[in-house]
Amino acid sequence: MTAYRGKYADELIANASYIATPGKVILAADESTGTIGKRFPSINVENVESNRRALRELLFTTPGALPYLSGVILFEETLYQKTADGKPFVDAMKDGGVLPGIKVDKGTVELAGTNGETTTQGLDGLAQRCAQYYTAGARFAKWRAVLKIGPTEPSPLAILENANGLARYGIICQENGLVPIVEPEILVDGTHDIDRCAEVSERVLAACYKALNDHHVLLEGTSLKPNIVTPGSESKKVTPEVIAEYTVRTLQRTVPQAVPGVMFLSGGQSEEEATLNLNAMNKLETKKPWTLSFSYGRALQQSTLKAWQGKEENVAKAQEVFLARAKGNSEATLGKYQGGAGGADASESLHVKDYKY
């Protein structure tokens, strides 16, 4: 049997292609209630449903921002929320030409027999949840696997376990009409250099695509959300041009050209770093059969949060900041970013060790 072609095949291919539209990006707004709770205290905002809804409305209704977005990844709570005037967020997105997506994993747990490595939960009942999310308006999904670099990590067991989990998630999504975004995140934590990150990234991505093929996943109806290949957080920094060369080479060696788009995660880079690295990749003159874009959460929202401060009178200012970040990253997908979007706050490091959504 080759790739699975069920009743949603044509829709999956069309939506995966749309997600990868050059000049458009994905906003990751799928932070769990707990993760939002870690960010709100920095701006003295209480972590309650009304404030979470207000932040999401600020983002989703920013004038002029939706044309820069192809999709928004939502937390389950947000999928069913509405704007202040009663319009479902899902409808507001669709009216603006943006595909709603949904985080479907249930977080990570320690993988027995390893040195603190993890596997991702959420396969139980996933088919039923995907069917419900499709009915609610979602058209793509996200599942995050997490690997770390250490003296002997990631272990072959952790790589295999997480690759198979991503593949099982992928085929279940496709059977229920959702484009699976495959996210094998290799954490930036550590003292390793960029060569070590590239080597690990190649092994992880090769294992993922072996598993996706073994599970008959239709690659044309998927998207990849990998880490950018960088030195570890405690290692010496390198230029965006070096990062671009290593990252694109890693993709060339591992990612089939049937995959329409690669939507990088920011992995705790500052907003400006993440944008400059993406821009350098798109300026690189080499074989790139996939659209190179991003699915950023922290790297699109941090400056916006600081401008908002949870206050109604700051919404317009915060939306201006969000629009500037969205526009800047859109330009970076075309290799046309000039730098400076978001002001001084955009250069602040967003790294959180052992980051959990």
From Swiss-Prot:
GO terms for biological process: fructose 1,6-bisphosphate metabolic process; glycolytic process. The keyword Lyase applies. It catalyses: beta-D-fructose 1,6-bisphosphate = D-glyceraldehyde 3-phosphate + dihydroxyacetone phosphate. InterPro entries: Aldolase_I_AS, Aldolase_TIM, FBA_I. It comes from the Eukaryota. The keyword Lipoprotein does not apply. It is found in: Cytoplasm. The record marks Y357 as: Necessary for preference for fructose 1,6-bisphosphate over fructose 1-phosphate. The active site is at E183 (proton acceptor), K225 (schiff-base intermediate with dihydroxyacetone-p). Pfam families: Glycolytic. Its EC number is 4.1.2.13. One of its GO terms (cellular component) is protein-containing complex. Pathway: Carbohydrate degradation; glycolysis; D-glyceraldehyde 3-phosphate and glycerone phosphate from D-glucose: step 4/4. PANTHER family: FRUCTOSE-BISPHOSPHATE ALDOLASE. This is Fructose-bisphosphate aldolase, cytoplasmic isozyme. It comes from Spinacia oleracea. The lineage of its organism: Eukaryota, Viridiplantae, Streptophyta, Embryophyta, Tracheophyta.
